[in-house]
């Protein structure tokens, strides 16, 4: 089957992680609840930061963008899952699958790059506090975010275009929650060696480079904090980094569970890792960042009071 016929006629069946009607009902309500919590948490973070002038700083600017990315990410995948749980027709078109894959790759990459920029922000704030205002100027923050978006869009486009060169034949049944690059390559009947090599090489660069940068930044941060004589100032400095470290650990940990395995052993039933990476991480990020943050507590409290305040 050539590429033109494939794009016009083929479709995939997103069978999910269970074909039992009873389990699908349980999964529907579970994912719906998690989706609503994720949307509410990230929207509140964005509203709190945008409405409080005290939070108009580089750290919270990038946090608001991280929340927006997580919001977009779950909206790209979960609504289709919910429809499939309730429908007998679980088909997704070839174009729809590629579109979902494009946004999936782009948004995961964007999350990764924003986390790296946030690590740089913490490095400058703790290791070079006297230069923080100039080093993290509004113009530079916008430039860094624009670079993150640009690289993410290009990387998503690259992988999606590579997948259009793949020929699919036989049953196009995806025992998975959404269209994923590794899953689709498992369904290919053409030679995917070159595409897999490009995928691994570019993935290592896109994800391991920021991880290495974050690791180096935190080594410098820890060394600087250990030199602070005051115990209270040490605690304050550590607490400003703890939330970011928690999110980074959750992000890379779940990503590694899903993707750090050879293509031929990639499991279509690896449901726990998939749910962690696709749903739990975006849901937990707002809680991790607001858990011990007094400024965020205050801003969220003011937003909630305005939302529920009765008009006089």
From Swiss-Prot:
The UniProt entry's sequence similarity note says: Belongs to the G-protein coupled receptor 1 family.
Native species of this protein? Answer: Pan paniscus (Pygmy chimpanzee)
Which InterPro entries has this protein been placed in? GPCR_Rhodpsn (IPR000276), GPCR_Rhodpsn_7TM (IPR017452), Olfact_rcpt (IPR000725)
> Quick one: a GO cellular component term?
plasma membrane
Q: Name one Pfam family in it.
A: 7tm_4
Q: What PROSITE patterns does the record tag this protein with?
A: G_PROTEIN_RECEP_F1_1, G_PROTEIN_RECEP_F1_2
Q: Which domain of life is it from?
A: Eukaryota
Chain's role: Odorant receptor.
Mainly localized where?
A: membrane
**Can you name this protein?**
Olfactory receptor 1D5
Q: Where is this chain glycosylated?
A: 5
Q: Which PANTHER family match?
A: OLFACTORY RECEPTOR
Location of this chain's protein in the cell: Cell membrane
Q: Which residues lie on this side of the membrane: Extracellular?
A: 1-25, 80-100, 159-196, 261-271
List the ranges whose topology is Cytoplasmic: 50-57, 121-140, 221-237, 292-312
Where do transmembrane segments lie in this chain? Answer: 26-49, 58-79, 101-120, 141-158, 197-220, 238-260, 272-291
List the molecular function annotations (GO) for this entry: G protein-coupled receptor activity; olfactory receptor activity
Q: How does it sit in the membrane?
A: Multi-pass membrane protein
- Please give the positions of the paired cysteines in each disulfide bond: 97-189
Give the UniProt keywords, A-Z. Cell membrane, Disulfide bond, G-protein coupled receptor, Glycoprotein, Membrane, Olfaction, Receptor, Sensory transduction, Transducer, Transmembrane, Transmembrane helix
């Amino acid at each position: 089957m050539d590429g033109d016929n494939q794009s016009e006629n083929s479709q995939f069946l997103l069978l999910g992680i269970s074909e039992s009607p009873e389990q699908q009902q349980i999964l529907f309500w579970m994912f719906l609840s998690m989706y609503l919590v994720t949307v509410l948490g990230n929207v509140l973070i964005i509203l709190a930061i945008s409405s409080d002038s005290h939070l108009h700083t580089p750290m919270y600017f990038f946090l608001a963008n991280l929340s927006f990315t997580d919001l977009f990410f779950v909206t790209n995948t979960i609504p289709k899952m919910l429809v499939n749980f309730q429908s007998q027709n679980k088909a997704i078109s070839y174009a729809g699958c590629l579109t979902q894959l494009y946004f999936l790759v782009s948004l995961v990459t964007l999350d990764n790059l924003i986390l790296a920029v946030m690590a740089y922000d913490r490095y400058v704030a703790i290791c070079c506090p006297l230069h923080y205002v100039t080093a993290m100027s509004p113009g530079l923050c916008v430039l860094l975010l624009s670079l993150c978006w640009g690289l993410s869009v290009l990387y998503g486009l690259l992988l999606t275009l590579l997948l259009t060169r793949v020929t699919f034949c036989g049953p196009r049944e995806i025992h998975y929650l959404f269209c994923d690059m590794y899953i689709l390559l498992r369904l290919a009947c053409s030679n995917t060696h070159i595409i897999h090599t490009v995928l691994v090489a570019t993935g290592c660069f896109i994800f391991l480079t920021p991880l290495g940068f974050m690791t180096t930044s935190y080594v410098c941060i820890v060394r600087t904090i250990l030199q602070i004589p005051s115990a209270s100032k040490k605690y304050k400095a550590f607490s400003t980094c703890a939330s970011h470290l928690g999110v980074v650990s959750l992000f890379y940990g779940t990503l590694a569970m899903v993707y750090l395995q050879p293509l031929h052993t990639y499991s279509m039933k690896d449901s726990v890792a998939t749910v962690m990476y696709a749903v739990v991480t975006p849901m937990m990020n707002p809680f991790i960042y607001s858990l011990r943050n007094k400024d965020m507590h205050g801003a969220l409290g003011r937003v909630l009071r305005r939302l529920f305040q009765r008009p006089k």
